[in-house]
């Protein structure tokens, strides 16, 4: 039999090891810095697809002949893609248990990204506070930076989001077979 644990998920059955399920409001401490674990090498196809998907018609992103005549010499990666990528990289540490994003502020793009750059990111918790209107969530503000393979910052912003409090996370659907199909292995 399983019983609820503090996160609002069910306790694992004997022999199961729970995976990472994300932070809850009480886990955020102002001053903590998270180096997000996954980098992404941006390909030309990533830039082309995102730019066309969002109907951005700037030649800076999609026309290599035009871009060859600019000071950069190559197409620049769409900055909205860079924002989405770095926000996505941060979710494992910041917002797996998000209730809602409240906003991105002070977005800065100090250095261009081009196809072939590998982007990494980190975030620092700036503040936490209880929500005045929703007792089941708290509000967290972070500063996030994305940087390339050379350590050059390519984007920075502040992000504010609501995240569930401990004991208030909605129950997760558990899709699993009735019995384990894994072979027995002695360790």
Regions found by a protein language model. Name each.
Residues 40, 108, 158-159:
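Basic side chains
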Residues 2-103, 155, 166-187:
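Hot-dog-fold acyl-thioester-processing enzymes
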Residues 101-103, 128-135, 158-168:
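Short flexible/disordered coil segments
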Residues 140-170, 176:
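Flexible glycine-rich active-site/ligand-binding loops centered on an Asp-His dyad
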Residues 104-148:
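Hydrophobic beta-sheet segments that form the core/acyl-binding groove
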Residues 42, 113, 129, 150, ...:
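Residues that cap or initiate secondary-structure elements
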């Amino acid at each position: 039999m399983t019983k609820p644990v503090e996160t609002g998920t069910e306790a694992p059955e004997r022999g199961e090891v729970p995976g990472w399920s994300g932070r809850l409001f009480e886990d955020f401490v102002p001053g903590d810095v998270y180096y997000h674990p996954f980098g992404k090498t941006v390909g030309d196809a990533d830039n082309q697809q995102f730019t066309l998907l969002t109907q951005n018609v700037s030649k800076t992103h999609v026309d290599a002949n035009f871009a060859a005549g600019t000071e950069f010499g190559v197409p620049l990666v769409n900055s909205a893609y860079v924002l989405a990528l770095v926000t996505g990289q941060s979710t494992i540490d910041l917002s797996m248990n998000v209730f809602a994003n409240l906003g991105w502020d002070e977005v800065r793009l100090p250095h261009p990204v081009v196809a072939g750059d590998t982007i990494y990111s980190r975030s620092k918790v700036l503040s936490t506070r209880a929500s005045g209107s929703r007792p089941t969530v708290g509000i967290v503000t972070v500063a996030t930076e994305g940087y390339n393979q050379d350590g050059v910052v390519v984007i920075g912003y502040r992000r504010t989001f609501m995240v569930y409090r401990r004991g208030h996370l909605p129950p997760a659907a558990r899709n699993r077979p009735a019995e384990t199909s894994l072979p027995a292995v002695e360790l």
